[in-house]
Amino acid sequence: MRSATHATLALFPLNTVLFPGGPLRLRIFEPRYLDMVSRCMREDSGFGVALIVAGREAGGAAQTVAIGTLARIVDFEQLDDGLLGITARGERRFRIVHVHQESDGLNVAQVEWLDDELRAEVPPQHAVLAELLRRALEQIGPAYGEVTPAYEDATWVGMRLAEILPLAPIERQELLELRDGPERLHWLQSRLDIQESRDDDSDD
């Protein structure tokens, strides 16, 4: 069931936060998720990723936050241990309206799509963050495949930094839920300024 504003998605609760445009690598071994992946590849559809707030990734049920991200499979392989490995990429954000559990334990959600953020350039006061990201991605390597970097785009820079900086999952979730690129950069700049202040104090 799909409309311009709503859809039905299989949910994959995880202890991580997926951002639009971000990479996600998973090892798939539970039957419910093997079936989900098979269906997604057969129908060229995606699945929903949402941060767990109660429960576990493997086995049983898990409760999640309300805001998640659509993931679309872009590659798959058989891993050395024989399990299925998939690479997915985040697309658009959604808000969970209702969840039910199917007989195989798979959570299926009715979701409402969230609007994409309006494009905004990185404000001059946050240009240092774009440069920080550039240097970090040079160290990390091709984590984003053939995606062309957009160091002038406030949303792209903020989301990529939110993925690679050492933040708690709930902090990443807070950044995912922000709807404004420059506001996300302000959050990150404030956090980095606080950390630098603590580091300076520890050196005294």
Question: Model-predicted segments: where are they?
Answer:
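N-terminal low-complexity, acidic/polar interaction/targeting segments
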Residues: 1-204
